[in-house]
Amino acid sequence: MSFVAYEELIKEGDTAILSLGHGSMVAVRVQRGAQTQTRHGVLRHSVDLIGRPFGSKVICSRGGWVYVLHPTPELWTVNLPHRTQILYSTDIALITMMLELRPGSVVCESGTGSGSVSHAIIRSVAPTGHLHTVEFHQQRADKAREEFQEHRLSQWVTVHTQDVCCSGFGVVHVADAVFLDIPSPWEAVGHAWDALKVEGGRFCSFSPCIEQVQRTCQALAAHGFTELSTLEVLPQVYNVRTVSLPLPDLGANNLETNMGSDASPFRSGTPMKETVGHTGYLTFATKTPG
């Protein structure tokens, strides 16, 4: 099993996502002889998981069932153990697009945190790209290395344990893109410039507060970055339904027309009241050659 390449059968050591019902999932490490307790009963790894195809519907001990899903960065994001606050797929999708990530890209990232963005970046740059991710907290860095090893992603990622604001990314002029998710990104802008290739590259920073954005933009302009832009992603859910409106009364002179016409149903989309709130601002910039 790899987050980069799909495999059909579940093997010992794989990470599997158990779908327990609407909106309820859990990630498990498949181990021979192990058991997982769910609200539907016990799931025995040796009998119920190992050797079965991903996507199987598995009956638990109490008669309920779960679906065993192949892991993806998106599923991992909603099931990972939180060591820090994380970014979710809505923001990650825009980051991936605006940084122009593709197979073969080299990316520098800080901080690693819980690895939510890291998994998505690795999936985007594999099989010929690489991620250099920097985490100053030793225990979080060690845990990230362990997870990358378990998910068979180690060949595409190098974890550096250092303060990016003081020591940079550990590489110079190799990156096609840089992503920062740290409290003071403006202090690392100079290191981001040095990490990007001489011929240029893309920059992105995530910040919850507009004051952080202002200081980051000032630092970006001072270091020579161009095409600065800041975006906020706020998804809006729409309720789509079929509506039939009554025909208007056009008076006695139009009685025959009214009697011969039926109300035409049409589909209408109205925004739902519930909407996702503010997560943060995404600031993008470009290092141009020269």
Curated annotation (Swiss-Prot):
Binding positions for substrate? 279
Coiled-coil region:
none
Question: What's an example GO cellular component term for this entry?
Answer: nucleus
Highest taxon above the source species = Eukaryota
Tell me the Gene Ontology biological-process terms attached to this UniProt entry.
Answer: mRNA processing; tRNA methylation
Q: Which residues carry this modification: Phosphoserine?
A: 264
Q: Where is this region: Substrate?
A: 20-22, 35-42, 64-65, 85-89, 110-117, 180-183, 205-212
Annotated S-adenosyl-L-methionine binding sites: 87, 114-116, 135, 140, 163-164, 181
Recorded hits in InterPro entries, A to Z, give: SAM-dependent_MTases_sf (IPR029063), TRM61_C (IPR049470), tRNA_MeTrfase_Gcd14 (IPR014816)
List, alphabetically, the Pfam families matched. GCD14
Query: Sorted alphabetically, which Gene3D superfamilies does this protein's record hold?
Result: 3.10.330.20, Vaccinia Virus protein VP39
PROSITE patterns in alphabetical order: SAM_TRM61
Q: What is its EC number?
A: 2.1.1.220, 2.1.1.-
Catalytic activity of the protein: adenosine(58) in tRNA + S-adenosyl-L-methionine = N(1)-methyladenosine(58) in tRNA + S-adenosyl-L-homocysteine + H(+); an adenosine in mRNA + S-adenosyl-L-methionine = an N(1)-methyladenosine in mRNA + S-adenosyl-L-homocysteine + H(+)
Q: Which residues cross the membrane?
A: none
Q: Give the N-acetylserine positions (modified residues).
A: 2
Sorted alphabetically, the keyword list is: Acetylation, Methyltransferase, Nucleus, Phosphoprotein, S-adenosyl-L-methionine, Transferase, tRNA processing
Give the UniProt family note.
Answer: Belongs to the class I-like SAM-binding methyltransferase superfamily. TRM61 family.
What's this protein's function?
Answer: Catalytic subunit of tRNA (adenine-N(1)-)-methyltransferase, which catalyzes the formation of N(1)-methyladenine at position 58 (m1A58) in initiator methionyl-tRNA. Catalytic subunit of mRNA N(1)-methyltransferase complex, which mediates methylation of adenosine residues at the N(1) position of a small subset of mRNAs: N(1) methylation takes place in tRNA T-loop-like structures of mRNAs and is only present at low stoichiometries.
This protein is called tRNA (adenine(58)-N(1))-methyltransferase catalytic subunit TRMT61A
What organism, scientifically named, is this protein from?
Mus musculus
Read off the lineage from the record.
Eukaryota, Metazoa, Chordata, Craniata, Vertebrata
